[in-house]
Regions:
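Active-site pocket-lining/capping segments in soluble small-molecule metabolic enzymes
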Residues: 1-40, 59, 63, 67-188, ...
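Short, glycine/polar-rich helix-capping loops at beta-to-alpha or helix-loop-helix junctions
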Residues: 42-46
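A cross-taxonomic marker for long C-terminal extensions/tails that follow the last structured domain
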Residues: 52-55, 82
Length: 251
């Protein structure tokens, strides 16, 4: 953090109160963003972080609906950032213990749910197997799209039936929600790039840059292009996308 400040970075993102406290006291000139791992889901929580650590932006967890995001944005003095595309987490972010149960490493400390060193792929007559710390997470036939092995998206035998007990491999894609997110005052959108290749990041950011520019120039005429959908679909986990928690029919 000290080196980052010396190099003049634009902002630092953090969740640990100790880190935030050190940064705000030692480097008050630094712009601090609250990470999604802070798991702040309401205006009161954001006000706490702003008062004690002077955060300038907060990334909301992916478990909130559009109605909840709208409520937070309307009642918070802290600018809001939301996830727009990438891996989907169904857990209360910053509080998941599934990965550490299997790998022995905390996502909060090590930065990933499934460390690359714990992932192993193998192919045999039964298909393609994905393991995490030698625990079989899923097995795919030749015509099935394979997802990255995370425990919450594994396929397991439950009650004699093999299925995705928690969540299927899928990616969050909110291109269709861009006008609504802009209208409710969302300051920025976040593209999940952890454990992704430069090629993945390049293609996703190109699509989103084009979409954001198109919306800014003519918001009333904004429409998602088929070409954008095709690119993002090809980069999605399991070759499928979802609106995740943003879409809840009862809200």
């Amino acid at each position: 953090m000290d080196r980052a400040a010396d190099h003049g970075v634009d902002a630092l993102i953090a969740a640990d109160p100790g880190v935030l406290g050190y940064a705000s006291q030692r480097h008050p000139q630094l712009t601090l963003h609250l990470s999604v791992q802070g798991s702040a889901t309401n205006a009161s929580a954001l006000a706490f972080y702003a008062q004690h650590y002077n955060i300038r932006r907060a990334v909301l967890p992916r478990v909130l609906s559009l109605a909840q995001v709208r409520q937070v944005a309307a009642n918070s003095t802290v600018p809001i950032e939301v996830f727009a595309f990438g891996s989907l987490c169904i857990m209360a972010e910053g509080r998941c213990h599934l990965s550490s149960y299997i790998t022995g490493e905390s996502p909060n400390l090590c930065g990933v749910c499934s460390p690359a060193k714990a992932v192993r792929w193998s192919e045999d007559a039964e298909g393609l197997s994905a393991r995490l710390s030698e625990v079989l997470i899923d097995r795919y036939s030749a015509d099935e799209p394979a997802g990255y092995p995370t425990l919450c998206k594994g396929r397991f035998l439950v009650g004699g039936k093999r299925f995705h007990a928690l969540e299927e491999p899928t990616s969050l894609d909110t291109l269709d929600l861009l006008p609504e997110l802009a209208a409710m005052g969302v300051e920025a959108v976040k593209i999940e790039g952890r454990q992704r290749s430069p090629a993945y990041v390049e293609q996703v950011t190109q699509v989103w840059r084009a979409a954001l520019d198109a919306h800014r120039l003519a918001p009333e005429r904004f429409a998602v292009k088929d070409q954008w959908r095709q690119v993002l679909a090809g980069l999605s986990e399991g070759s499928q996308t979802t609106l995740g928690a943003y879409h809840r029919s009862w809200q």
